[in-house]
Amino acid sequence: MFIMSNNITVSVIIPAHNEERYVVRCINSVKRAAERVKCGVEIIVVCNRCTDRTAELAAANGAVVVTDESRCIATVRNTGISAAKGRVIVTIDCDNRMTENTLREVLGRLNSGKYIGGGAQVKFERYSFPIRVNEIICRLGFKFTGLYCGIFWAEKSTFKAVGGFAEKKAAEDIATAINIRRYGKKEGKKYGCLKNNHLINSTRKFDEMGDWLYFRLAFRNAGALIKAALGDSSDYDKLIDEMFYDYNDRKRENDLSVQS
């Protein structure tokens, strides 16, 4: 198990569904960040319905491996939080990376007593005009709502107080940010955003399906989005399954068919 010292202070939770291509890269980014703090850091990879080498690679690279078979990313993250030994929880998706001073800044903000928790700005690992537009839209949304996501950070006691990640199939990150911010107000603390570090966001879906991907999806699925806004999320849930929960399954099937 990867621990920078005997006493674990920080637990980094990485949910993973068939992520053998990305899990080592993500773990290594956490290790680099862990080298810059003077406390114990554990890495927990939550293997979700994995049929590839994700668990094997995660364990070989020092992560604690736990499993969860649900089809809800929030539930997967909550499984990792339940297994965590650290006082501080940080979550990051497996295809993404954190910058090297992320954990140091997280600890500084939480130890200041001013912050209940928060998120981070997002920067993509490559850029084009449509990806830049996508980033601008995300940044504007974060700025006007104050609900920063990407990398979540808070004390484990805070996640326990709000019931963990909101167990919704979609927009669970926004719902969780709202819950943590609301709880923070009661405690006299702010929901914040890292200023000097950020999430390095994977562009794998853009690489495979084109850089205008999310604009095309929004246009083609406008009806599903409107129905979801009015309370009927059935069509939207199918879209979420296709683009997220089943994405790696399709990718793996395609890779295996090419190899055969």
Protein language model annotation of sequence segments:
Residues 158-161, 169-188:
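A short, conserved alpha-helix in the catalytic core of glycosyltransferases
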Residues 89:
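Short aromatic/hydrophobic "clamp" motif used to bind/position activated sugar donors
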Residues 100-130:
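Conserved donor NDP-sugar-binding/catalytic core segment of glycosyltransferases
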Residues 47-55, 96:
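A conserved acidic beta->alpha catalytic loop
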Residues 39-49, 66:
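Short beta-strand/loop segment that forms part of the nucleotide-sugar
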Residues 9-11, 42, 175:
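Cell-envelope/extracellular polymer assembly enzymes that use nucleotide-activated donors
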Residues 19-34:
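Short, well-formed alpha-helical segments that are part of the catalytic scaffolds
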Residues 68-84:
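Glycine-rich, basic loop-to-helix element that forms the pyrophosphate-binding segment
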